[in-house]
Amino acid sequence: VLSEDDKNRVRTSVGKNPELPGEYGSETLTRMFAAHPTTKTYFPHFDLSSGSPNLKAHGKKVIDALDNAVEGLDDAVATLSKLSDLHAQKLRVDPANFKILSQCLLSTLANHRNPEFGPAVLASVDKFLCNVSEVLESKYR
């Protein structure tokens, strides 16, 4: 459960932040594909090279979805319901990949936002991403 302090940290470090560009999403995907090559199987029609238009476009979708999750922080289930349905029922993404993506996003944020991305912010954003993953995984049960 996110405390009010956690929510405030998430809102200021992740939500609708002009300094959190779509490039962070693209970089996050690049990290994920490099560290976990099996995740590439969900993108057979994409150019998966670093900085490709496909990665930039999908990376922007990832960041936009996170922005929506931050906006709906108090009702994550309702906010992420359609996204969860899409990934569980249509795309059939292995739910373990949400945690992998979360860890890659944390690495990207820590790399670009240091030193403001200190231990307290890292812990709050990690809790937030765990909550997002949990909601996205809920439609698999």
From Swiss-Prot:
Pfam families: Globin. PROSITE patterns: GLOBIN. Red blood cells. One of its GO terms (cellular component) is hemoglobin complex. Gene3D superfamilies: Globins. SUPFAM superfamilies: Globin-like. O2 binds at H58. Residues 1-22 are annotated as: Disordered. Residues 1-141 form the Globin domain. Keywords: Heme, Iron, Metal-binding, Oxygen transport, Transport. GO terms for molecular function: haptoglobin binding; heme binding; metal ion binding; organic acid binding; oxygen binding; oxygen carrier activity; peroxidase activity. Heme b binds at H87. GO terms for biological process: hydrogen peroxide catabolic process. The keyword Metal-binding applies. It comes from the Eukaryota. Belongs to the globin family. Involved in oxygen transport from the lung to the various peripheral tissues. This is one of two types of alpha chains found in viper hemoglobin. Heterotetramer of two alpha chains and two beta chains. This is Hemoglobin subunit alpha. It comes from Vipera aspis. The gene is HBA.
